[in-house]
Amino acid sequence: MTFTASSSSCAITESPVVVALDYHERDKALAFVDKIDPRDCRLKVGKEMFTLFGPQLVRDLQQRGFDVFLDLKFHDIPNTTARAVAAAADLGVWMVNVHASGGARMMAAARDALAPFSKDAPLLIAVTVLTSMETSDLHDLGVTLSPAEHAERLARLTQQCGLDGVVCSAQEAVRFKQAFGAAFKLVTPGIRPAGSEAGDQRRIMTPEQALSAGVDYMVIGRPVTQSVDPAQTLKDINASLKREA
């Protein structure tokens, strides 16, 4: 079934699920999207797809009624990052992110760049520690903290800079909700329904566990995109989350 919208305005969804689109071909991506309902999820577009297909892909998804998380993890000097974030807002995305390790001045500049957009501004989220990273990876970079400790330090800086939330692992969610409050949004990759393979994520949880931990938005990729019936898979995930709630 194909779901279309008459304009670029996005459908309202209460689902916390964000489906990660990872396709090498635009037609295959849109064929998948046309099988699912924008009431059941939002969509994430990352570096590879945006580099291949550009802003028009985002517009194509919006025209089908979907909110789009533009996952480009901007990390540059403050002025360049601010301009990039403003460009994302001009595109009408629902969420955009930056690397918290870019520092306070960079994050503050990104935040200020969204002020002219007022209520139409996207959520501005910072990446703390990539979910693929382990303690040994941080040590290689000269960081002596554990991934959890380093993520909390960066999350605290993010909140101090006035951003909307962070990308973090589900294991950090309980502590972060307690430390930073319910309004501080937690976006978590590495979410996989029971029985799914871990893939290249090292710190993973099921959707039900993530919801219980305090995750606001959960990114799920291949368990949905490679499903024989992605629409039903999404409905099953959302039903399980409603039972958990």
Curated annotation (Swiss-Prot):
It catalyses: orotidine 5'-phosphate + H(+) = UMP + CO2. InterPro entries: Aldolase_TIM, OMPdecase, OMPdecase_AS, OMPdecase_bac, OMPdeCOase_dom, RibuloseP-bd_barrel. Pathway: Pyrimidine metabolism; UMP biosynthesis via de novo pathway; UMP from orotate: step 2/2. One of its GO terms (cellular component) is cytosol. The active site is at 73 (proton donor). This is Orotidine 5'-phosphate decarboxylase. The keyword Lyase applies. Catalyzes the decarboxylation of orotidine 5'-monophosphate (OMP) to uridine 5'-monophosphate (UMP). It comes from Salmonella typhimurium (strain LT2 / SGSC1412 / ATCC 700720). PANTHER family: OROTIDINE 5'-PHOSPHATE DECARBOXYLASE. Substrate binds at residues 22, 44, 71-80, 131, 192, 201, 221-222. Its EC number is 4.1.1.23. Belongs to the OMP decarboxylase family. Type 1 subfamily. The keyword Lyase applies. Keywords: Decarboxylase, Lyase, Pyrimidine biosynthesis. GO terms for molecular function: orotidine-5'-phosphate decarboxylase activity. Homodimer. NCBIfam families: PRK00230.1, pyrF. It holds the Pfam family OMPdecase. GO terms for biological process: 'de novo' pyrimidine nucleobase biosynthetic process; 'de novo' UMP biosynthetic process.
